Amino acid sequence: MAGVPPYGMHSPTQQPRYPSYSPSTRDRQPYSGNDPYQHPPRTPPSFAPPSSLSRSPHFARPPSPMNTTLPPLNGTVVNADGSPPYHGHSGSATSGYTLPRPFGGSLMSATSHSPPPSYSHASGSHSHPSNIPDSFSQSPKRESEPYDVRSDRTGPVSQTPARPASPKESKSARSNPMSFANILSGPADEPPPRRSSPPPQTYKSSTLPPIAPTPKVDKEPLSEPEKRRGSSHYETAYNEMPHRPAMNGFTPAKSPLAAMPSPLSKSRKLVDEEEIDKISRENIARALEQIDALDNSDVEAPGFEQEWERYMAKSRKRARELDAIEGRKRKRRRTEFLGKLAKMFEKQALQGIERFNRIHEAEVQMEVQQKEIQEEKERKKDMQRKRRRENTVRHEMEKLNAAQKKANKIEDEAEKQKLAKEIARSKKKIKDTTLALERGEASQEISEVNPLAPNLEGGTTSSFHIRTKSPPPPKKRAAKGTSSRPRKSKEKKQAEKDAAEAAYAAMENEDLVPLAPKEDPRKTSLKKESKAARSKEPSPVPATPYDSKGYNQFYEQLWRDIARKDIPKVYRIKVVSLSTRQENLRKTAQLAAKQARKWQEKTNRSMKDTQARAKRTMREMMTFWRRNEREERDMRRLAQRQELELAKKAEADREANRQRRKLNFLISQTELYSHFIGRKIKTDKAQDSGDATTTAAIEGNGEGKVPDSLVPLPDGGAKVTSFDDLDFDAEDETALRQAAMANAQSAVQEAQDRARAFNGEENKMADFDEGEMNFQNPTSLGDVEVSQPKMLTCQLKEYQLKGLNWLVNLYEQGINGILADEMGLGKTVQSISVMAYLAEVHDIWGPFLVVAPSSTLHNWQQEIVKFVPDLKVLPYWGSAKDRKVLRKFWDRRNITYRKQSEFHVLVTSYQLVVGDAQYFQKIKWQYMILDEAQAIKSSQSSRWKSLLGMHCRNRLLLTGTPIQNNMQELWALLHFIMPTLFDSHDEFSEWFSKDIESHAQSNTKLNEDQLKRLHMILKPFMLRRIKKHVQKELGDKVEKDVFCDLTYRQRAYYTSLRNRVSIMDLIEKAAIGDDTDSTTLMNLVMQFRKVCNHPDLFERAETTSPFSVCYFAETASFVREGPFVDVGYSTRNLVEYDLPRLLCSPEGRLDVAGPGNNKAGFEGRYLSHLMNIWTPENIRESMSHNDAFSWLRFADTSVGEAYEVSHKGVFERAVRRRDYSTRLSLLDVAYDAEDGVNINSVHVHSLFNIVERNDRRALADITATGYMRELLNVASNVAERGGIRTIEPCAKPGASAPPITISCSGQAAIAEARATFFNTAVRHALFAAPTKAMEEEILSNKLDPAPYSLRPLLPQPGSMKGRYTNITVPSMRRFVTDSGKLAKLDELLRELKNGGHRVLLYFQMTRMIDLMEEYLTYRNYKYCRLDGSTKLEDRRDTVSDFQQRPEIFVFLLSTRAGGLGINLTAADTVIFYDSDWNPTIDSQAMDRAHRLGQTKQVTVYRLITRGTIEERIRKRALQKEEVQRVVISGGAAGGVDFNARSRENRTKDIAMWLADDEQAEILEQKEKEALEKGEELGAKKGRKAAGKRKRDITLDDMYHEGEGHFEDNSTKPSGAATPVSGDVSGVPGVKGRRGRGGGGVGRSKKAKTMKERLRLVDGEVD
């Protein structure tokens, strides 16, 4: 019901405060928040006003306090009937109904999620459902009616049923949101018009409308619902009052007649209906007559016009004022109410959102993820489709060009036309593909669709659908007969039925139905015949079927033939026809659709083309301007960049000139110093040892040089200028040259002063004249000639004597030096001779300090004692307590020791010098000798700094390889010997390490001038001789590279490793310089080298054995069992036969007599003796009568033997027969026959003999030749040919188990089993194994064991040839062939063994040495081993054994452990199984054999795997050797390719080793191109700031895992390090630090040692 009920009976001044709330009774849709406790307070409507007030003209109907068009708060649509969603409230000040309790039990829903009972009558609007009648009114003082909470409604207990909807009120389209009109209309459509209402009535203010006479109403009898309604407690007049439609949101007042209570309402049931009608008609007629009789009414009387107008004006004014006041109040109330409602709705909405999110969050996330994955897949598909189209366009363009060229050359017209077709086809394909590329999707073809239903305007939609990938929408049934298929008429349907009946009739007549067309005359005739037959015979008479056996068989045969042959054929024809027809119809429909669309395409194409052209023009214009702006911006940036580059270049040139002047100053200063010192100590003369090439080179280097005497020198009082105070920006270099001369003179003077002041008054150098030590006469002090000291027990060679002179001159000048003779030329003897010279000539007996690697400490001690017995040697090593005792012999009071001193020479290691530095620095040492000085190659190490702080007069460095890796190491040695001259300037360091090496990166020649200057600087401080120049009697050294190939297993491993890593990514990461990547690269290098050495370094072949299905012996503790545990016969099968104890006891045995078995004795007596036929008496009687035993005389058996045999078992008879021999072979001797004639004997012994007269032999002995002999004598043949008695079986069983035994709990069964298994006599007879007691008896009685050693009855088992085991050990033959290197080494060692050579075999990995030991054992080669784990005392004995025992063929050594301080001249062959990346390490190792004392030619073999990382490492080592030759030896620098890389690119260099030749060539080419553009390969723009770099992990640590630290690069203890018996931790000054850099126990998990890291990589750590 629309509108609100009438207001209460109040005066116009007493308007209701709150209008009544009456929601619509239409069906409402349920929504959240519609629970009863959420409804606003509802007030019942007030009573209807009286008729006088209703009809009063002063009564103005105020508008509804609620806005009728208030939008819904939760987004739902408004009511379909146009009624306002929120209706007015009652005008009473207090609510007539009590508010529903929000938490009451009667109105609360069953569950918090289930809808309340009122949801059964849901409303379509936003108002809350209510079943209170619209006309319900109640007094404000009246108590509210109780609510009835039921399953379908909520309201008062007694309630009038709702008024049914009017038949004229139809449900609008708006009320159905799924209607076609709602779907087609947009969200902004106007609301549908409300249902029709009567036009508004206008009232005149001057005159009142006349009252019409009361019409006659014929009352009809009340219906049953009206009766029920009348029986309610509401007034009948009000219930029966007709409802008028609302106008402007108000409900008009009731008519006076309707409002007045009828006097007959109380007695309606008592009065008859006829009397009521009669009284009503009479009253009405009487009232009409009275009205007609009146002339004028009171209202129509004149004279009240002005009063009426004044009254009406005041009424209108008052009404307007009241409306305004009420409007403001109403607005305020509405605002307040809506605010509360909005807050409540907002709270409910938020709770609903949270609840919805909580429920559907996971589902939404999954859906979004799936959507993203699907979008990513679609994007990839689009990219693939785009690439395919681009490739298609490119291929078609190539085909098009080729076809055009071919068409231009061909003259044949037919070929030209054919090519023209191909060209047109290619152009079309290119065009289509290009259009598809521009559109970004495939061409969409127009699909045929069914016509749509008519829209709101009455027509059909004019748009055409384009076929897409999405499935077509489901077909809807069109309205008003506009379906896609035309409806059939009745005639057509009847015709189809007739046709079907005709076909059925034809089939009944056994006539085939022809496939006739649609209008076939045959079909028409059939129809007519069927109709005529149907008309003539409306009810056919049923025919009696003919039944016979032949007929039925023939009938069934016909149907089978038809079903087998004709029906499939007809079906196929029908299917083909149908498919052809459908195809034709489809094509026709497509053509028709295309034709129908042409008119639309013509109209839309021009507009689309215009828009497309405009967009394209705009796009091109924007592209042009963007490109133009970008070009201008790039030009500006290019100009700025060029300016910056020019400025940088100018600044770089200025800085280069400054650095050049600075470098020239340093070199000039060093050259002046070197020239003077070199002339005095005669380095050239010491180096000149008869080699013409070297002499010529030296002389050539001196050409064009100004003599020293002509060099202008400053005065002696010239001021020394500090390096920082010099001005290197000035163009004039005169001041720099003068400063260099002054500084050089000062350095010489300072060295002399320091040497003189070291010993004070005892200084022997005081005899020299100070005036001679200047640059004016540089040759005055070089005339000192030194002869060999007498106390030296050996004879020095010529070059060694020259070296002694050079060392003595260095000492007398107070200058330090480097003795860099090649290994094996006697550096140790020369340094010892210097100490002997000082003791003999200058009476300086010490103290001398010799620091050497721990592996050579014993060698130094032995050499000093051997060559100079007068010098006392103090070996300083051992525990902290031992060293403390040794320090008591130190004499700190005397600077110079005498002959009577406690010691003269102290020999110690680098490790202990650094550890006890505080004690060593308190003593002034006369001479400090550092052996293997490459140990201090790093100027940043604590060892270098500690040794530099020692107080010593002179320092001497001994090294065979002054340059190992780069020039930086040589500079560190020079800086150590001359700290003041070779100061740690960055420019000087860069010139040594960077300028020379980086010069060779471009593969150009080295600067000859700089190289000459370098040689000139090094000459005074370093003496270098080579073996081939100074030692003529020493044999040559021949180096050979032996290339090996990868085996199949190695190649598989190598390829697998290469496939797991990306070489390009590694090189790009290496360019960044990350420490983690460096460690990863080194690990990869290690893995690749392992593959090249032997694949068993990754995975060893396992020892296999059959699966043992048995129980093994168990013991609680092997400690209690003694040293030897015999567990023979302890295994038991898992399957055992359990027997009762009775069966295994004597009581259960029938043949064993006992107290429990009485029958056994009876049977033994009677059956075995009395009734036995084998008794002697019975046998003898039978033989006398020629009965049963008469055959014994032919068997040569007596009666006693027959009786004995019958009472013994098989085993006893076999043992007895073992000693007997047949006499058949004797007949051959007694009766010889001629050759070839077989004469049989006729004696009694051989009357029944059917075999030859020979003893029975084994079949293997009878067959002398043929295949049978080979098969029967396999074991003997193998033993004869192979020299071994074992044969490998062809197959191994998969499982093994001991025999199944009987299990019984009785002791008797156990004793019987033991007696059976371990019967001494039986075992001796079967296996010929004498017992222990028998052997002791034979030995004690000194008997001959031959009679007691009988032939065993059982032959040797077959398992003895396989050594009684099924355990399979990995084949050593396969072990050798699995590695290409090992296979090549096997051949090489065989040749060397036959040639009488002895071999030194060097390895990089100790695990490979373990494998090599297995190989040498397999080949029976005698060997000895020395690696990092060898103790010092064992090391000395091992070297001595190899030198003195010629039968030792191979010496296994680790390159680092066996390459220092060892004399192994007994070997003449050196084999490097894997080369070191540092060539100097290999040179030291091979010089262990190629040194003084070697009389044979030394051959060096280097095994290299072809095409692997080893080949590239070898190339890199050759480049390093070339650096040493050029820099140190003074050779020509032409064509030298250092191919050196800077320190930053070391990781990239390692990564290049992993690439093959093609990849390396590509990478080098890319790097060159990148360098030309000014950018580095693989470098990224945004590099992170490098923090503290971790400790560099060198390849030395990676390669030499498990070896000792013989170079003492760290304080880690080693088995081959300094022989410390106690704790090294007792060294003062070296405390266990925690944290970074500390070697304490508290190492974190990340701070793993290199060995642990490698084990982790190799998979050896769990």
Swiss-Prot record:
Keyword annotations: Activator, ATP-binding, Coiled coil, DNA damage, DNA repair, DNA-binding, Hydrolase, Nucleotide-binding, Nucleus, Transcription, Transcription regulation
Start and end residues of each stretch annotated as Disordered: 1-269, 373-548, 685-710, 1574-1662
Compositionally biased residues, Basic and acidic residues: 140-153, 216-229, 390-399, 408-425, 517-537, 1592-1610, 1649-1662
Comp. bias intervals (Basic residues): 474-491, 1580-1591
Feature: compositional bias, Pro residues: 38-48
Ranges where the Helicase C-terminal domain occurs: 1384-1544
Recorded GO MF terms: ATP binding; ATP hydrolysis activity; ATP-dependent chromatin remodeler activity; DNA binding; histone binding
Protein family membership: Belongs to the SNF2/RAD54 helicase family.
Protein name: Chromatin-remodeling ATPase INO80
